[in-house]
């Protein structure tokens, strides 16, 4: 095992424990991990318990971005801590020594409930029947619009959200507003026939039309309102609802804006269900402060509750939090840069799977859904991402 980077001038005698400690710090620095060496420890721990394991599964269990996990895995393979197999990542003999002697890992079993997969609830026959209907309608969703941070949750996720609201007493007889609903969580919620009122506010007319068709076909009532949430809610929606549910853009200002519109709908008190991506500690502190400054407390948070279709950057998973609010206060930040692409602009490079040509997305072409190759190819694979500096 070599040590990444320089350790002072000349040769340095270090024992194995010091070598491993230096390795952790240097891997974290090399991979540019905001969480530091603890994140590298978490990756090794997950591999120790679950090997062989895929990069995607590691990202889900550690709640780290997939590109970060992939980078750490590559570095640890280079350092002979990990080896790559057809079934996924495994520890080498040196890696096992590192895990057991330095990190003091001993027990290799996961204690996460295999029935509920950590969600804390299961679907009975009633909700399974609802899920089967939601699966059919979810297939009719339009292409995602990545410029407004759309990322569709799986039908299972949407149904589990409705089941969680039921289990916590936030469904029966309640007035519920979905502040954005590209995940179609209003569908399983309506199919329970338990809520007093259900309404959806969204900027995407395609999503609203699909919800309207669903309502007509299934004989349920969901009020749909096309609205840009950068503007205050219509007057007839204010202080009307008991519960709001939102999966906002994954920026602090995006969260503030969507929760503030939810507060307009709730009034001085109420319940909010917030779905959001796992963040480094500094960002998470900002998020917690924003939530508590509005008058909410996080009464419950379930990691890896939500799963998404094709959202590799967040390892396809986010948490759900149940917020309880009293003496609520609106707290709106910068409404111009609420979407991830505006706060952290990137250029993505996609390879045409038909001819192999490389295309840039993020400048003239804003989203891969609009990309068509000269050869006629319409299927692409992302091969590289580059961060851009904000202007």
From Swiss-Prot:
InterPro entries: BpsA, BpsA_C, rRNA_MeTrfase/Polyamine_Synth, SAM-dependent_MTases_sf, WH-like_DNA-bd_sf, WH_DNA-bd_sf
Superkingdom as given in the UniProt entry: Archaea
GO molecular function: transferase activity; transferase activity, transferring alkyl or aryl (other than methyl) groups
Alphabetical GO biological process terms: polyamine biosynthetic process
One Pfam family cited in the UniProt record for this chain: BpsA_C
Protein's name in the database: Uncharacterized protein MJ0675
Native organism taxonomy: Archaea, Methanobacteriati, Methanobacteriota, Methanomada group, Methanococci
